[in-house]
Design a protein with these regions (language model features):
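Pyridoxal 5′-phosphate
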Residues: 1-196
Length: 196
């Protein structure tokens, strides 16, 4: 509606790998007073063309999802003739670093550790995604004949993520059998009992 201030959505669902229609949402919001934030944590380094083509005001990314160090990310606000600068207020106050948005010293080593993986992921994403497709195919061949459901829209899903439910089987039992061959968890990374 015309009263909506912000739309925030994930580029890719972190548990199912389903790719969200951010380009369409960005296009629908263009020309409105609504700000558009994209959480590209899961898609950055894999779907960068989608990010280049989306009309967003704000973008969040992180280094550790592309083999960079933990503890560093980026919050990007677009500012040009077609994008209004969002009215973002700092979470902490102090010095005038980062145009007053963030006090303290920038962690240069972490920033440098973010730069190379970002460059490499942009150049090598197609090769990486093809490798993930091959691994996903092998995995699905290995479970062929079992009673399972792939969760999420498989037509619009990252090949690097599989969310699967095995019917009538205890998740912990599966984990014990295949943990040497596959990297997986039986819960989200946010869940304290997760092995992710």
């Amino acid at each position: 509606t015309d009263k909506t201030l912000l739309v925030s959505m994930m580029q890719v669902n972190s548990e199912t790998g389903v790719i969200q229609p951010i380009e369409e949402v960005g296009a629908a919001l263009a020309g409105t007073k609504t700000y558009f934030h994209v959480d590209a944590t899961q898609g950055f380094g894999k779907l960068n063309d989608s990010l280049r083509n989306t009309k967003y005001n704000m973008l969040s990314i992180t280094a550790h999802k592309i083999s960079g160090p933990q503890g560093i990310g980026a919050f990007i606000m677009r500012r040009d003739r077609t994008y209004r600068r969002p009215p973002v207020k700092p979470l902490m106050y102090g010095g005038q670093q980062e145009r007053g948005y963030r006090p303290g010293t920038t962690p240069v080593a972490l920033v440098a550790g973010f730069a190379l993986p970002a460059q490499l992921s942009d150049k090598e994403s197609a090769v990486h995604m093809e490798s993930c497709r091959a691994i996903k195919r092998r995995f699905l061949e290995a479970v062929e004949g079992l009673n399972y459901t792939l969760n999420g829209d498989q037509e619009h899903c990252l090949p690097s993520t599989v969310n699967i439910s095995f019917h009538g089987v205890d998740a912990e039992g599966i984990f014990l059998v295949v943990k040497e061959d596959y990297a997986f968890s039986n819960g989200s990374a946010c869940n304290s009992g997760s092995h992710a």
